[in-house]
């Protein structure tokens, strides 16, 4: 079992590109890409984590 993680150190960003590379958050919500996910992580004060890559 390997921990799944994403480096969000350069976030938040004011605007995200529209590339579609889905990630599934610990809130069971599918995020369109790393940028959208990382912005949500920052907003959650680090309580949101990555569940897995791909749609939930």
From Swiss-Prot:
Domain remark text: Avian ovomucoid consists of three homologous, tandem Kazal family inhibitory domains.
GO cellular component assignments: extracellular region
Q: Which UniProt keywords apply?
A: Disulfide bond, Glycoprotein, Protease inhibitor, Repeat, Secreted, Serine protease inhibitor
Question: PROSITE patterns per the record?
Answer: KAZAL_1, KAZAL_2
Q: Where in the cell is it found?
A: Secreted
* Annotated S-S bridges: 8-38, 16-35, 24-56
The protein's site described by Reactive bond 3 is found at 18-19
Query: According to the UniProt entry, where is the signal peptide?
Result: none
Q: What is this protein called?
A: Ovomucoid
| Domain Kazal-like: start-end pairs | 6-56
Q: Name one Pfam family in it.
A: Kazal_1
Sugar attachment sites: 45
- Stretches of the chain forming a coiled coil according to its record: none
Keyword Disulfide bond in the entry? The reply is: yes
For molecular function, the Gene Ontology terms on record are:
serine-type endopeptidase inhibitor activity
- Principal localization? secreted
Q: Which InterPro entries match?
A: Bifunctional_prot_inhibitor, Kazal_dom, Kazal_dom_sf, Prot_inh_Kazal-m
Q: Which CDD domains match?
A: KAZAL_FS
